[in-house]
Every structure is written in C-alpha cells, then in structure tokens.
C-alpha cells in the first residue's frame, strides 16, 4: 500500500509508470486497474498506453499495442505472448477477468466520500467479494491512496492484517 497526500506523484509512479514497466517485463500477464471513477481509471489506462507507445519506451522494449481502447487493450510481441490491461471504476465490471497485478488507485475520491460509512462499506465489500477474487495465484495487489479516514479501505485492510 502506498499512502501520500494529494498531488505528490503517487499515481504517476504507481498507476502509469509501474504498469508500463510491469507489462514490458511480464508480457503474458494481465493488469486490472481500478479507481473511484471509470473516468479516472480510463485516464490512467490511456497514459499507460501512451507511455508504452513512446519512443523512449520503444527503444528499451519493442512491444506492439495489439488492440486499442481505454477500457481494455492488449500487447503483442515476437514471442506471441499477450499481456492485457483492463480499467474499471470501483464497483465496475471486472467479474470474469483475471489479474496478475491488481492496482486500486484512489478508491475514495475526497472527504465527502470518506465520511460516508455506506461508501466505505461498499468499497470494502467490493474489494473482498469482487476485486480480490480476480487475483491469479501469486498475483499482487497495489493500493494507492490518500488516507481520508481511519476506516477507509486501507484502514480496514490494515485491521484485517492485525487480526490475522
């Protein structure tokens, strides 16, 4: 888990640069990236695609963007291995998909959402019953967020870890 205040670069590093590097290094793996809104998740998806398509990146790794789109896209390479990237909002459609890497960036938008017990519970339940169940064996989860509330998703997961 990565916790920092807003505007400190956590999304740039963890939701854009890292997934591009990860897909280049693990060209058969699947990434699912979620955020509080579909719009933000799609923005990250587009930025990852642009990073991979950049000349600098292509000088390091020759990877072709096999399919285009903000919601779902794939990479292909000489070995014919396919990596994929799926973007969704919290509570969005990831059922039926698998993830070697699950990125949850800013599951809570602001103080207003954080102060809503209903929203916090909904996010936690989505994580337990949907998001976490998409993880492949030996997969990894990265949660990036500003801590708006002691009982937010990260707070609940930290409490769960203490109990277990």
Language-model regions, residue ranges each:
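Glycine-rich phosphate-binding loop of nucleotide-binding enzymes
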Residues: 18-35
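Short, solvent-exposed loop/turn segments at secondary-structure junctions
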Residues: 7-8, 38, 92-93, 108-109, ...
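Non-catalytic, compositionally simple segments
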Residues: 112-164
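Short glycine-/polar-rich loops that comprise or flank the Walker A/P-loop
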Residues: 27-29, 83, 98-99, 136-139, ...
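A short acidic (Asp/Glu
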Residues: 12-15, 42-46, 152-158
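Walker A/P-loop
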Residues: 1-19
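Conserved nucleotide-state-sensing and coupling region of NTP-binding domains
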Residues: 30, 34-94
């Amino acid at each position: 888990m990565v916790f920092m205040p807003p505007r400190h670069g956590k999304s740039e590093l963890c939701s854009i640069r890292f997934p591009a590097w990860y897909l280049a290094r693990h060209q058969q793996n699947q990434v699912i990236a979620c955020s509080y809104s579909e719009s933000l998740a799609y923005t990250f998806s587009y930025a990852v695609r642009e990073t991979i398509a950049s000349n600098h990146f292509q000088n390091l790794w020759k990877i072709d963007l096999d399919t285009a789109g903000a919601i779902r896209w794939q990479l292909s390479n000489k070995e014919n291995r396919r990596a994929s990237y799926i973007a969704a909002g919290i509570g969005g459609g990831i059922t039926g998909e698998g993830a070697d890497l699950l990125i949850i960036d800013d599951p809570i938008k602001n103080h207003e959402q954080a102060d809503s017990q209903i929203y916090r519970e909904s996010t936690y339940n989505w994580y337990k019953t949907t998001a976490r169940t998409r993880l492949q064996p030996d997969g990894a989860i990265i949660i990036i967020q500003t801590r708006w509330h002691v009982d937010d998703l990260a707070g609940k997961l930290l409490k769960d870890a203490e109990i277990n």
